[in-house]
Amino acid sequence: MRRKDREITDPNAIFAVIEQCHVCRLGFCDDGDVYIVPLHFGYERDEARATLYFHGAQEGRKMALIAKNPRVGFEMDTGAEVYTRGAADVACGYTARFQSVIGTGSASLVHDANEKRRALEILMSHSVGKRDWTFDERMLAAVAVFKVEVEKMSCKSHE
């Protein structure tokens, strides 16, 4: 990271930023092309490591790319706001507040029904703040759930 003065390294502070984010952009490599998709997500923390959970249709480009090459990049951000810190009539008089997390990891499908249910519970809890969901078994069977085991991540904040 070029701006070390903006880097957040404390795992608790990084996860506090993740907690404020509600959309994660996943980047896939598709035969030399880049495919990026914004997704709602949930996460699970184990010390300084994270697992991100997502859901979607069982077929489509995401699922094909996970099967083909599980390596992914991700980005999430929160608190974006452009404001003036100087002369309001000069473009360079503006800057932006934000907090962001970027990283890489390996994506895989979740097949086990209990893990799938737990992953959806985590995702829904992060998205709407509620736990103890009832899942219709037909819907559970119809949805694809996948996870990204985060291998590297960095966090940046600018106030």
Question: Model-found features: residue ranges?
Answer:
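Helix-adjacent hinge/juxtasegments
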Residues: 61-85, 92-93
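Short beta-strand segments
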Residues: 21-58
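Residue-level recognition of well-ordered beta-strand positions that form the cores
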Residues: 40-42, 75, 106, 149
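Extreme N-terminal tail/first-helix region
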Residues: 1-19
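General beta-strand recognition
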Residues: 51-53, 73, 147, 154
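A generic structural signal for short beta-strands and their flanking turns/coil linkers
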Residues: 22-24, 37, 48-50, 68-72, ...
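Short Pro/Gly-enriched beta-strand edge/turn motifs at strand-loop
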Residues: 8-10, 20-25, 129-131
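Charged, gly/pro-rich active-site loop segments
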Residues: 2-5, 80-159
